Amino acid sequence: MHKSQAGRPCENMKKPESYNFNVNPRKPNGLFMGILKTFAAYPDMKRRDFECEYINMDGIKPPYFLLANHASEMDFRILYAAIRPYNMNYVVAIDAMHDNGIGLMRFAGGICKRKFIQDMSLIRNMKYCVDHYKNPICIYPEARYTFDGTQSYIPPSVGKMAKLLKVPVVVLIAQGNFICCPQWNKDKFYKRPAPCKAKLVCVANAEEVQALPAEEINRRIAEVFVYDDFAYQYQNKIALDFKQRARGLHHILYQCCECGTEFEMYSSGTTLECRHCGKKWEMTRYGRLEAHDGNTRFAHIPDWFRWERENVRAEVEAGTYCIEDEVEVHTLPKNKYFAQGRGKFRQDSTGTHFSCKYYGEDFEMHLAPNQLESVHIEFDYRDRKKREFFGDCLDISKHDDSFWLHPVN
């Protein structure tokens, strides 16, 4: 983990204005989006030999409810290429609004939200776009980037949202967007031109949405919402010769599958190693792992990642799971980060807990397991506006602010 370097604590400061989620979203500006797609999205997709398969899409026109997998910075380019020539309104997290500018993101049709909180204004804003702008309305139902190139949990509320919108439900599954730009190795992704493919599938038309129960809509979504980008790479023999392709892999493969030691893994170049037992693996051009000693337990990276999650689940069920650390805290109420100094973070089988000074006042947050379905994690995060280095972090939100927690140890 890296220590945060951004800003001094704001003591005795009045809490800044929070983002107003009640403001109506804007219709995407046609001229602006036309320029952006023509000179950025479409050329890059052409360079990556983009192809999209359309399934059950005959007669399906906007507005529709579009659910897409979330893998990398490539996602929006793929989206616009797949739904060409339409523009869309889309749900975007407040940190992305901050990084790219609130005005610009709203100009492009963005609908701001905070991650993993119940938000009635989001429902109202999505319904407003469907009723007034007649565009596709897009969400990333996983609500975070995939770390291993496979699908994540999708909440059952998605089916209920579809029933409320009363428009067709369409799923976009992209491939190749993760292997060229995994979240633990994002630098120079332009130099990794993996071919990108996608399929756009209508899982329920407007009449079916109104007739089917939310549970059946969720079942249809889950049936289609399946992907594995490392398998896609290996099966299609997509060779990525990037010399630092394994760098950062230890962020997700943090537990040695040979000796079981946690947080002593290291990666650089094309090599992953355990500094406790000395075991080493090579990450091949095709995204596979090969042990230097010839004894490879997990050649497929998602299998190793799944094994780690199963270990954590066993700890939770046994009541022994616990992670605790001192953290540096930054808050993001609207479009600027504010340093809050040091705090304490703990997650165990009882839930997620942290405390800190919050604009000069003592603050605590306690969330039971059923109150927080997931957390958003960033590796080597930077405040793009100030070009300041935050390091590894996670963020947890309440309705009027977001807390970015940077583990110190």
Each predicted region: which residue ranges?
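Short, non-ligating residues that shape and space the ligands of small metal-coordination modules
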Residues: 263-266, 283-284
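A cross-family acyltransferase "interaction/gating" segment
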Residues: 135, 147-215, 219, 240-260, ...
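Long, charge-rich boundary regions
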Residues: 280-360
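Phosphoinositide-dependent membrane-docking surfaces
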Residues: 66, 346-384
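Acidic, Ser/Thr- and proline-rich intrinsically disordered linker/docking segments
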Residues: 373-409
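Helix-to-loop junction immediately C-terminal to a conserved catalytic motif
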Residues: 33-70
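Catalytic core of membrane glycerolipid acyltransferases/transacylases, capturing the structured
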Residues: 61-118, 166
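Residue-level preference for the first positions of well-ordered beta-strands
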Residues: 63-65, 136-140, 170
